[in-house]
């Protein structure tokens, strides 16, 4: 943490704004992004505009600001949040000189949205608080940049990778196997981590960057990402980058990526059973963890539970089914929302509909386990609530958000 400190008066003013942030936080952050992109359009090359339109990015930022204000007396309490965001920043190649731009526009947004409630004293207190928090991020990210670049096979910023193989996994999911274009060493990674892919799409003014989980075990001589083609739904447009990768990136093409990042990683120590619960393309980081355990010959009980619309959309089923058939310590169960007649013949399909508490209870004979889950947010909220009701200790519960971090608290 930074050695800088805030005066007691500044802390009191910041804490006094907590109710205001609870009420107006998203309005402030939406205005902030609009203002910042207007004054600094070059930052559109970094931020995911789909998440902006969905409101997920402003909501995530509002939650972070609220948490910082609430814990201004003890910023150590939000270090896990800082670490998670810093991993994302390092992956996106965020630079220290961009923090003052964010601070300037955030304070201006507070003033313009809150009006008289944003007095000079309030804005000055938040300026001091922001500078302290920004310094924490800059120091944490500096260390992350150094670790990524100094690791064997590591690098800083972006590196060119060739698509060695492109493999269809389901109706909407495809894997890309990537190797360094320069033929040099490839950095290892922790199972569960992700990389950022940067693409320049013809006809688009700005570059696009997206994070994709590495979906295979490390030390295989390649990185594998497994990408769902986002088709769009209602007001949500089709995914710009996912459709570009599916339709226009082929074997032999080159992608620019950053070194692996992320703190959703496999904790290999211990003897408890490991339970993986995935929904849709949320299977990808869990497959990296699962394959790592299999590669290392771990004897702990491993239970893999996956939910999909049906077999048509289910990626990597054959691999999981074969492994479960061959390994006594591996158990595999599938839940299909709308199974086909063929799906009903699948011996691993155990439920039709959605994963619920009774289904998990029927599969898991021992709740004293380490749980890892990833998938759509409503799916994750369901799993989180079940584990909370079961009194599973927090240190045994691990999950990953795709996109801006949110909250799994029941609404």
Curated annotation (Swiss-Prot):
Cofactor(s) listed: heme b; FAD
Organism: Halalkalibacterium halodurans (strain ATCC BAA-125 / DSM 18197 / FERM 7344 / JCM 9153 / C-125)
Record keywords, A-Z: Detoxification, FAD, Flavoprotein, Heme, Iron, Metal-binding, NAD, NADP, Oxidoreductase, Oxygen transport, Transport
Listed name of the protein: Flavohemoprotein
FAD-binding FR-type domain sequence ranges: 156-267
GO molecular function, one term: nitric oxide dioxygenase NAD(P)H activity
Reactions listed under catalytic activity: 2 nitric oxide + NADPH + 2 O2 = 2 nitrate + NADP(+) + H(+); 2 nitric oxide + NADH + 2 O2 = 2 nitrate + NAD(+) + H(+)
Domain notes: Consists of two distinct domains; an N-terminal heme-containing oxygen-binding domain and a C-terminal reductase domain with binding sites for FAD and NAD(P)H.
Family, similarity comment: Belongs to the globin family. Two-domain flavohemoproteins subfamily. In the C-terminal section; belongs to the flavoprotein pyridine nucleotide cytochrome reductase family.
Note on cofactor: Binds 1 heme b (iron(II)-protoporphyrin IX) group per subunit.
NCBIfam families: PRK13289.1
Protein's job: Is involved in NO detoxification in an aerobic process, termed nitric oxide dioxygenase (NOD) reaction that utilizes O(2) and NAD(P)H to convert NO to nitrate, which protects the bacterium from various noxious nitrogen compounds. Therefore, plays a central role in the inducible response to nitrosative stress.
Chain's gene name: hmp
Sites annotated Involved in heme-bound ligand stabilization and O-O bond activation: 33
């Amino acid at each position: 943490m930074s050695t800088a400190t805030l005066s007691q008066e500044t802390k009191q003013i910041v804490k006094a704004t907590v109710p205001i942030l609870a009420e107006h936080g998203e309005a402030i952050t939406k205005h902030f992004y609009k203002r910042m992109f207007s004054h600094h359009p070059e930052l559109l090359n970094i931020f995911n505009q789909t998440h902006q339109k969905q409101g997920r990015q402003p909501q995530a930022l509002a939650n972070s600001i609220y948490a910082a204000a609430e814990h201004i007396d003890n910023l150590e309490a939000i270090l896990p949040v800082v670490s998670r965001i810093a991993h994302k920043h390092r992956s996106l190649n965020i630079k220290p000189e961009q923090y003052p731009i964010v601070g300037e526009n955030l304070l201006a947004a507070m003033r313009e949205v809150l009006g008289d409630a944003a007095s000079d004293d309030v804005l000055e207190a938040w300026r001091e608080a922001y500078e302290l928090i920004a310094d924490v991020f800059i120091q944490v990210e500096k260390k992350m940049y150094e670790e990524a670049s100094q690791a064997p096979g590591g690098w800083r910023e972006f590196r060119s990778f060739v698509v060695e193989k492109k493999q269809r996994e389901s109706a909407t999911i495809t894997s890309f196997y990537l190797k360094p274009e320069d033929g040099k060493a490839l950095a290892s990674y922790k199972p569960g981590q992700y990389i950022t892919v940067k693409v320049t799409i013809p006809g688009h003014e700005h570059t696009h960057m997206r994070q994709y989980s590495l979906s295979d075990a490390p030390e295989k001589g390649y990185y594998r990402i497994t990408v769902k083609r986002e088709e769009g739904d209602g007001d949500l447009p089709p995914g710009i980058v996912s459709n570009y990768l599916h339709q226009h990136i082929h074997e032999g093409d080159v992608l620019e990526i950053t070194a692996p990042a992320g703190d959703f990683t496999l904790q290999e120590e211990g003897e408890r059973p490991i339970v993986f619960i995935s929904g849709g393309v949320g299977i990808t980081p869990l497959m990296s963890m699962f394959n790592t355990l299999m590669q290392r010959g771990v004897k702990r009980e491993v239970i893999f539970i996956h939910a999909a619309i049906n077999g048509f959309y289910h990626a990597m089923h054959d691999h999981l089914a074969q492994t479960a058939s061959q390994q006594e310590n591996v158990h595999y169960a599938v839940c299909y929302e709308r199974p086909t007649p063929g799906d009903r013949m699948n011996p691993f399909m155990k439920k039709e509909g959605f994963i619920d508490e009774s289904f998990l209870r029927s599969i898991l004979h021992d709740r004293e386990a380490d749980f890892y889950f990833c998938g759509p947010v409503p799916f994750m909220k369901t799993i989180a609530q079940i584990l909370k009701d079961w009194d599973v200790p927090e240190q045994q519960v691990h999950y990953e958000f795709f996109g801006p971090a949110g909250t799994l608290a029941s609404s």
